[in-house]
């Protein structure tokens, strides 16, 4: 499979998954405004897709949202196959992506250092 085709398929899977989660999943533990699909890693044969998800909120909210996604995984996969018009949708593996959380933490630490440096110069 060409890398270009694989990338296009990953982008399309991300778009469709976002739509399914936002519009079709009715589990109250999943709030789409707090959930973002950050990346899709698709296997060369399209049989597996690692779905990296960022969830804003505390640890309990993240765990509950991940449990809800795991529970709905079968439905999400069949809806994905229907919308992509493929016979076999990839097996989905949801993973929590903490990169946004780490970025926010780093930004706040840099801001603290900047404020301390400003205070010591005065």
From Swiss-Prot:
Keyword Cytoplasm applies: yes
Gene Ontology molecular function terms on file: ribosomal small subunit binding
A GO biological process held by the record: maturation of SSU-rRNA
Intrachain S-S bonds: none
Gene Ontology terms: cellular component: cytosol
Pfam families: RBFA (PF02033)
InterPro entries assigned to the protein according to its UniProt record, in alphabetical order: KH_dom-like_a/b (IPR015946), RbfA (IPR000238), RbfA_dom_sf (IPR023799), Ribosome-bd_factorA_CS (IPR020053)
Major subcellular site: cytoplasm
Top-rank taxon: Bacteria
Keywords, alphabetical: Cytoplasm, Ribosome biogenesis
Keyword Cytoplasm: yes
Subcellular location: Cytoplasm
Quaternary structure, from the entry: Monomer. Binds 30S ribosomal subunits, but not 50S ribosomal subunits or 70S ribosomes.
Family: Belongs to the RbfA family.
NCBIfam families: rbfA
Function: One of several proteins that assist in the late maturation steps of the functional core of the 30S ribosomal subunit. Associates with free 30S ribosomal subunits (but not with 30S subunits that are part of 70S ribosomes or polysomes). Required for efficient processing of 16S rRNA. May interact with the 5'-terminal helix region of 16S rRNA.
Protein's recorded name: Ribosome-binding factor A
Organism encoding this protein: Syntrophomonas wolfei subsp. wolfei (strain DSM 2245B / Goettingen)
């Amino acid at each position: 499979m060409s890398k270009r085709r694989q990338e296009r398929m990953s982008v399309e899977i991300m778009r469709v998954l976002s739509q399914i989660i936002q519009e079709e999943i009715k589990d109250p533990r999943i709030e789409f405004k707090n959930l973002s699909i950050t990346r899709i890693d698709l296997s060369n044969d399209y049989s597996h897709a690692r779905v990296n998800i960022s969830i804003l909120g505390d640890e309990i909210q993240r765990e509950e949202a991940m449990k809800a996604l795991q529970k709905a995984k079968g439905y999400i996969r069949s809806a994905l196959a229907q919308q992509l018009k493929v016979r076999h949708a990839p097996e989905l593996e949801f993973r929590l992506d903490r990169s946004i959380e780490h970025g926010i933490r780093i930004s706040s630490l840099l801001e603290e250092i900047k404020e301390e440096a400003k205070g010591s110069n005065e």
